[in-house]
Amino acid sequence: MICDTLQHLTRYKGLCKNLDTAIDYLLTHDPASLPLGRTEVDGEEVFINTMDATLHSDHGYHPEYHKKYADLQLDITGSEGWGFTTNPGREIGDFTGDCGFQDSASVVT
């Protein structure tokens, strides 16, 4: 998972073909003008999920993880923070699709 801003995207070029495709798309299209929901860039290989998320404080945070896809998180409005942990906890709920959440007391923000 990569969490960063648009201005730093080129730092991640060359890591992976599909990531390069996503970066090239985001650098040539205004992410703030994308419709909410899924925008396909290269079918199932590269797509963008645009959401208007409800932000939470760093208390009670549940780390997100993915089994199939890499995740590039961009904060378009400049109001989101991220946390991480190197000590994942137990899985919360049923893992469906590609996204799951864990209960972890060691999240660093």
Where are the regions that the model predicts?
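Short, intrinsically disordered, charge-balanced linker/junction segments flanking boundaries
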Residues: S57, S106-T109
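A short mixed-secondary-structure module that forms the rim of ligand-binding clefts
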Residues: L55, H59-P63, K67-D71
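Short, conserved beta-strand element in jelly-roll/cupin
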Residues: K67-G81, T86-P88, D94-V107
